[in-house]
Amino acid sequence: FPYTTLFRSKPIDAGFLRIKKGTTEFDPSYHWVISKQHLEGFSVSPKYIPACRYIGNGKVCAYVFVKESNQSIGHIDLACVPVMMDLKSKTMKRINIPVSSGYSVAIEKYKDKVLFGNMNEKDKGIYIYDPKTNTASGKAVITTEGQAWQMHYFGE
């Protein structure tokens, strides 16, 4: 269960809480504050989680908001970093997909891969990430005219 600082005038920490299977209350023994954690390659910590998808075995593919520079496309900030999170070890690592606009942060599991909607300086569309090999497509495998802000796989 992710919690975030999005749309708050007074920021709070962002991260994850847990509700154990068969219960209805938050587990007081588990919480992970991502807004105080260092993300390799960045000088500032993530502020919140604009999108995430649980992919099994304690792993989450997500976008985290890391506002480090004035990188933008026109008036649109590029500050959403694709990451793989490990809820068990409370670690996150950047995925080799470009930093995206917050308007294009769709994440969907597709068979044994993960699809990331992304809008960056070079292209707009859908990237493919393979969590087993930790590899990603070097560019959008499907390009879009608008932002890929939502996806749903109607399969197994």
Can you say where each PLM-predicted feature lies in the sequence?
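Short, small-residue-biased leader/transition segments that mark boundaries at the very start
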Residues: P2-L6
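Active-site-proximal structural scaffolding
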Residues: S9-I12, T144
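Surface-exposed loop and turn segments in beta-propeller and other repeat-based domains
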Residues: G22-K47, M84, K88-S101, I142-E156
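Hydrophobic, glycine-enriched assembly/anchoring segments
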Residues: G117-E156
